């Protein structure tokens, strides 16, 4: 079961939209739709009369609505097909530190009532809980039987296919474990920075990790939300992003890939 909601808020010279999306195994886990609608409407109104900011470097908080995109980037770089092509910036990082030592990222196909749970992959390889990142260290690359043979690795049980396609490499329930510092505390700690609530577009070079995405959200000044912002470009390098990333304790399982809100230091923000 799933839902998607989109709300438009407008004034005479300005219009903004807010959306929410959630997917669960059981309908009764989707939540209170009236509350979801009210919250979405309030968030759309908060976005009205957004401003542009000057180009600068600052700390950035990726809200939990968008932080899973960083795990999608991590998965793409850890996909054995990318490794075989030699175009991953993580190709030589197995058993090396990629995140700080407090971070662990798990792929667990055996979780109850989760979207991508399974007992085996599509090639019959037994599914097991595996740490992709354990205490900051990269543990494995996702593979299928074919890509495992090409890399001379053991199969990890991550083959997936539709009825009409050949097996390809995928994940099961991939998530980053909770951190200790709340999003509210993160906001309070920032003198000037950005809370990202929406990402759009993508320009990511997986050969070297260069990262650039369009974004909108809210500007933070002196530890408080100051005003809505839009038409921003966030730029950095994924190795630097991963190494400085700090997760909050607000993980929710709403999709196949899930992550809590994340604070990342010293990213370039392109504005006016």
Language-model segments: which ranges?
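N-terminal small-residue-enriched
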Residues: 1-272
